[in-house]
């Protein structure tokens, strides 16, 4: 048996075990991390040589879900895992975002961390343990790393914080908060919550930070026993003479180029100055060094202006929002639409309503099987005025869409209140920063324009950070793209007037203090109120009527014991209803039936068929049915779908009938009255009493009738 090093802790009432040396022994570092019965294999491999031609940290984090982990066989034709699920992509981003700032920016050797979920107890989410596992392998390895970090999930139920809640506990929780932090600072926050007040959210972040300390202690213990000596950090310095020459050439001109509020004018001015600079110095210095020094001058100008003058290079105040505009109903035919503009950032959001059958089917390790609300974020190249390849959404697009989706879920009506599947598409048509929060604003308005009865409007804002010497800092409201690029933090907050619905915090520094967190959260609240006022002017309440082009949903209830009658053998009956009426039909286990149709006539037709299928035949009632079979002694008539009765030959007419065929033939529609339902549930019918209301029906025992030829069919003597 292979000997492994094992380390244990009890976290949140469940055992956490990190083991190294048993699997993936050829990787630079590898651990298995198990929490309760959820287990992951986390590996790190580093290239031996720097990657040529890159000016960034080449870190790749892959999060892979194995379906066997939950005892599943993958769907699809080939029955094996394919491209990562949306949840796997988000889990990979959850790991990448806090670790990247803690690795040296100068590192050019490719790093690959692969997180593989190899066991899932379907109770505990594996994502945060991917973060802890990745931090552990970096801590053990030779790679320079300013961790370790801990990652904790926090729920809030019945006035108490819950550490690492299960899927079942999260369903009852008011928040789903993930915090990643080092010993002293927070490096990543992600939250979805049901309008949580700002002060409570800050307390929850503090609670998670404290819980992370034990995970950091555990990794320090592992490093002490298994850690390798760290490699030196590469030095990538721009020669001093280049920096001096560039600074002298652009002195005073950088601020002038950056002063334009219009993004296009600003970029043109910056590029024009860059061209002059390169032309003037290219014969003396390397172009790469010139461009790097110029980039530092731009960064210095942006940051120093904010820190020293409390104003931005384009003249906007520290807490001043860009020009806002909101408009709804901008497109014909669609079910709902809106356009939200903030400066040069514009997002068009479209709402499409469908039946509950159109909910997304999830094939992964998450607790959910279906999703009735989807928000898809698209970022086209033209939104930044660039020429780029346009293809399927990448990790960034999926992450931004998930954030906006999470922000809106708390205000959505339940399926019982609004039995629709809702698809949102947020198309970014102009980008100068904070498009994800623009997507929240435009999508909120689009939902209301579509007539979705959302509880409240939701708005989002991004708060930036510029840090200086001696722990000085400045938080700035509504950051533009250039401030995001040269700043230290992107603190996104979405919510209503009554609280926070989503947070996502990414940063370039090695963590932020609780003073920064507090300032950012309350600064976002102030800005959110201003944005909501602008949105209210466009549309303050959801429309009371759906678009004429949206499907209508009609809800009825049937006896749960009759569900089988509606579905039919192998779904034959329900498929027939859908085809006949051009509707959608969704049936819940409690007998709730939702019919979706583009017009009321089709819906009512489907409703009638379903009601007839589930209706009990009553003695004395009159029905119009179709003759299905003819015997020598009478005719069988289907009076309700799947329910036949017999009209004896003596009850076919108000005169003597010699042959049944003289009065009716198969396919004829006749009106009959139920005269009797015998002890075996067989239905006796009379046409004679319809033709002659004064006639008295004859009670008869069908067992005394002549035996007919032909095979026995159960429906000949039953309700079915």
From Swiss-Prot:
Domain S1 motif positions: 620-688
Cofactor(s) the protein requires to work: Mg(2+)
Entry's Gene Ontology cellular component terms: cytosol
Domain KH residue range list: 551-610
SMART domains assigned to the protein according to its UniProt record, in alphabetical order: KH (SM00322), S1 (SM00316)
Positions of Mg(2+) binding: 484, 490
InterPro entries noted in UniProt: ExoRNase_PH_dom1, ExoRNase_PH_dom2, ExoRNase_PH_dom2_sf, KH_dom, KH_dom_type_1, KH_dom_type_1_sf, NA-bd_OB-fold, PNPase
Reaction catalysed by this enzyme: RNA(n+1) + phosphate = RNA(n) + a ribonucleoside 5'-diphosphate
Subcellular location: Cytoplasm
Entry annotated with the keyword Metal-binding: yes
Entry EC no(s): 2.7.7.8
Positions of the UniProt region annotated as Disordered: 697-720
Alphabetic keyword roster: Cytoplasm, Magnesium, Metal-binding, Nucleotidyltransferase, RNA-binding, Transferase
A single GO molecular function term of this UniProt record: polyribonucleotide nucleotidyltransferase activity
GO biological process assignments: mRNA catabolic process; RNA processing
Similarity comment text for this entry: Belongs to the polyribonucleotide nucleotidyltransferase family.
Role, per record: Involved in mRNA degradation. Catalyzes the phosphorolysis of single-stranded polyribonucleotides processively in the 3'- to 5'-direction.
The protein, known as: Polyribonucleotide nucleotidyltransferase
